[in-house]
């Protein structure tokens, strides 16, 4: 299932190039504020109670044709996540001149809540004279389905709800940086979406093609 938030943070299911509104399936959704926080609450309810809500979501999605995706304002599927954690070392198996040794002690950084925007929203580049270049990095994001800590590798995917596109915007060349905020976490620097794809739809998350379009151009 492909889940998204649209317009005033309604919950939708993407079918082809059309979106069906399934907000009514989520208990209490219509009483939440039509804001990023309200949308986050809806999606977190779906993630937390997906086993019990799935049949209703599938039924509701099958009853309507839906609206064209292109006619809707697509919001980030997790507009205010409690934690947006990114790793500095990704894609260890990519083609390089020299093989890379495995990384066992990863270093992480956070994206701020205000850095998160929808996949088609405008990314704002502030005046940072020290920055040599602003770089968008396409990422394959894991959406956690429950709390996890000290999880064995063999059962790691049991904690995953689904996956989504994510872009890490970085300002390169800033000298003497002591934190990641200035070059990683400013407003609009974390586009995501348009959808969360539930785990059952992707057989092997280690074998997914990740591509990036910048201003309509494939990079």
Regions found by a protein language model. Give the residues of each.
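N-terminal non-catalytic cap/leader segment that marks the start of a structured domain
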Residues: 1-106, 200-203
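Glycine-enriched loop-and-adjacent helix/strand subsegments that border the catalytic/binding cleft
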Residues: 75, 81-219
């Amino acid at each position: 299932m492909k889940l998204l938030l649209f317009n005033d943070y309604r919950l939708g299911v993407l079918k082809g190039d059309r979106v069906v509104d399934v907000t009514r399936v989520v208990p209490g959704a219509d009483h939440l504020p039509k804001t990023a926080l309200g949308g986050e609450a809806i999606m977190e309810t779906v993630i937390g109670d997906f086993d019990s809500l799935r049949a209703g979501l599938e039924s509701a999605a099958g009853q309507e044709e839906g609206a064209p995706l292109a006619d809707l304002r697509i919001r980030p599927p997790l507009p205010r996540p409690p934690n947006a954690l990114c790793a500095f070392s990704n894609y260890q198996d990519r083609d390089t001149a020299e093989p890379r040794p495995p990384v066992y002690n990863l270093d992480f950084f956070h994206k701020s809540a205000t850095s998160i925007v929808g996949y088609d929203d405008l990314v704002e580049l502030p005046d940072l004279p020290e920055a040599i270049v602003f770089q968008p990095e396409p990422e394959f994001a894991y959406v956690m389905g429950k709390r996890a800590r000290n999880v064995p590798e063999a059962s790691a995917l049991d904690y995953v709800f689904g996956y989504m596109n994510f872009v890490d915007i970085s300002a390169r060349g800033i000298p003497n940086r002591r934190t990641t905020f200035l070059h990683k976490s400013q407003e609009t620097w974390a586009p995501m979406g348009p959808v969360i794809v539930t785990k059952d739809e992707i057989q092997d998350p280690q074998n997914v093609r990740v591509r990036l379009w910048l201003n309509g151009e494939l990079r």
